[in-house]
Amino acid sequence: MEVHNVELVMSAVAPSQYPTTGFPEIGLAGRSNVGKSSLINVLINRNSYARTSSQPGKTQTLNFYKVEDQLYFVDVPGYGYAKVSKKEREKWGQMIETYLTSRETLRGVVILVDARHAPTKDDVAMYEWMRYYEMPLLVVATKSDKIPRGKWNKQESLIKKTLNFQAEDDFIAFSAKTKEGKDAVWQWIEAHTVGGN
């Protein structure tokens, strides 16, 4: 998709604040600092539209980015960051669960994992949770440029094995630095929004 118009239209914490346009939505989920903002910036051809932060846990709301008056990217608060209080984490968890399980315009979820490491317990829990709700899923392994080519197959196998990855879901290696995977991610998004369901 050629992207010219992007707008952060809403930072929401409750369903009453969600956009009401009816455009299809793609949720972007992953632990703090996995690269969600960088993925959004690459997809929309901007350097710093979605705020990237060196402080994990910075995103505390559901941020709705309207893309080309056709769909929304919904940046979900990063999970699994220890310095946030337990009460805060529970509040985020409830907000995320409400959105991911009851939003009728949600067409799929992109779960981001760090390609350099095995998925965390939080990553595994998010993947299993979305599978339980039968949500179309794309796992994006970020920072893939950090993995030497000769070791990539082994690393991909480790990620998939840890997640208990299912064949009907999709998996894409992505690098914000080299733009590897950008077109493939867009194809998946379009298939589940403007070009599909």
Swiss-Prot record:
GO cellular component: cytosol
Needed co-factor(s): Mg(2+)
Residues annotated as binding Mg(2+): 37, 59
Signal peptide per UniProt: none
Protein keywords: Cell cycle, Cell division, GTP-binding, Magnesium, Metal-binding, Nucleotide-binding, Septation
Domain called EngB-type G: residue spans: 22-195
MF annotations from Gene Ontology: GTP binding; metal ion binding
Positions that bind GTP: 30-37, 57-61, 75-78, 142-145, 174-176
SUPFAM superfamilies in UniProt: P-loop containing nucleoside triphosphate hydrolases (SSF52540)
Biological process per Gene Ontology, one example term: division septum assembly
InterPro entries: G_ENGB_dom (IPR030393), GTP-bd (IPR006073), GTP-bd_ribosome_bio_YsxC (IPR019987), P-loop_NTPase (IPR027417), Small_GTP-bd (IPR005225)
Superkingdom in the source lineage: Bacteria
UniProt cross-references to NCBIfam families, sorted A to Z: GTPase_YsxC, small_GTP
Cited function: Necessary for normal cell division and for the maintenance of normal septation.
Family membership noted in the UniProt record: Belongs to the TRAFAC class TrmE-Era-EngA-EngB-Septin-like GTPase superfamily. EngB GTPase family.
Protein name: Probable GTP-binding protein EngB
The organism of origin for this protein: Lactiplantibacillus plantarum (strain ATCC BAA-793 / NCIMB 8826 / WCFS1) (Lactobacillus plantarum)
